[in-house]
């Protein structure tokens, strides 16, 4: 399997990348596009590209329809329930499930496999720590594995969720110990992991203290009562009032 070509990303790669107006990485000839509500939109997610790589051949022929029919005969259990829980159609869920089972015959993705996936798409840096945090965000029940249900529910939020849903998902990602608060230590760990993942191929090259500065700007904006932690209420209110943050939400999809 060949890693997908690198796309333009924010230099810190985060949902809140515009807090300090961090410049974007530049690569000539490649433009970011807003995901469309189609199968191609699903494939913009690097994890989905990996999962669907064996089920989305270039061009079309009679074998495509045969594959779709075989998918219908082997629907995942609870397909109707998943359709109700997500914003994917039955056909999209079937396609996602087929790819998931092709790459993960056990029906599970463990953390080591998830890290290997992410390493392919960020070869210029070290994605290990960020992949660990992201894995925990997808692993909704905390059992150490991502089930198909975990995957599609999270993906539905990230690609087709409301602003409120996406922000709540991001808060859960940043709240590393899941106690309902984001501390400076947690945010610094997230920022360092994102900067490590992006590597040295950012423009301009980032200073060593850039992650800490980003965290300080984050707390100046989010921590209304200055108690040293950010609650979900503070996070949602501050984000939805900030035009830069709202316009940068698409950048989060590029990292995922």
UniProtKB/Swiss-Prot annotation:
Check the record and name the CDD domains matching this protein. Answer: EFh
Residue numbers of Phosphoserine PTMs: 14, 60, 63
Quote the Gene3D superfamilies the UniProt record gives.
Answer: EF-hand
**Which parts of the sequence are annotated with region: Disordered?**
1-20
- Summarize the subunit comment: Binds to DNA as a homomultimer. Dimerization is induced by binding to calcium. Interacts with the C-terminus of PSEN1 and PSEN2 and with PSEN2 CTF subunit. Associates with KCN1. Component of heteromultimeric potassium channels. Identified in potassium channel complexes containing KCND1, KCND2, KCND3, KCNIP1, KCNIP2, KCNIP3, KCNIP4, DPP6 and DPP10. Interacts with KCND2 and KCND3.
Domain of life of the organism encoding this protein: Eukaryota
Q: Where does Ca(2+) 2 bind?
A: 223, 225, 227, 234
Any single Gene Ontology cellular-component annotation: plasma membrane
Secretion signal span:
none
Tissue specificity: Highly expressed in brain. Widely expressed at lower levels. Expression levels are elevated in brain cortex regions affected by Alzheimer disease.
Identify this protein by name. Calsenilin
Query: Where, subcellularly, is it found?
Result: Cytoplasm; Cell membrane; Endoplasmic reticulum; Golgi apparatus
Q: Which InterPro entries match?
A: EF-hand-dom_pair, EF_Hand_1_Ca_BS, EF_hand_dom, Recoverin
**GO biological process terms, semicolon-separated:** apoptotic process; negative regulation of transcription by RNA polymerase II; protein localization to plasma membrane; regulation of potassium ion transmembrane transport; regulation of signal transduction; signal transduction
S-palmitoyl cysteine lipid sites = 45-46
Q: Which family does it belong to?
A: Belongs to the recoverin family.
- GO MF annotation terms: calcium ion binding; DNA-binding transcription repressor activity, RNA polymerase II-specific; potassium channel activity; potassium channel regulator activity; RNA polymerase II cis-regulatory region sequence-specific DNA binding
Query: What lineage is this protein's organism placed in?
Result: Eukaryota, Metazoa, Chordata, Craniata, Vertebrata
Does the keyword Ion transport belong to this entry? Answer: yes
Q: List the disulfide bonds.
A: none
Give the PANTHER family listed for this entry.
CALCIUM BINDING PROTEINS, CALSENILIN
Cross-link Glycyl lysine isopeptide (Lys-Gly) (interchain with G-Cter in SUMO1): where in chain? 26, 90
Which topology term describes how it sits in the membrane?
Answer: Lipid-anchor
Q: Which SUPFAM superfamilies match?
A: EF-hand
Tell me how the protein is altered or processed after translation. Palmitoylated. Palmitoylation enhances association with the plasma membrane. Proteolytically cleaved by caspase-3.
All residue ranges annotated as the EF-hand domain in the record: 67-123, 126-161, 162-197, 210-245
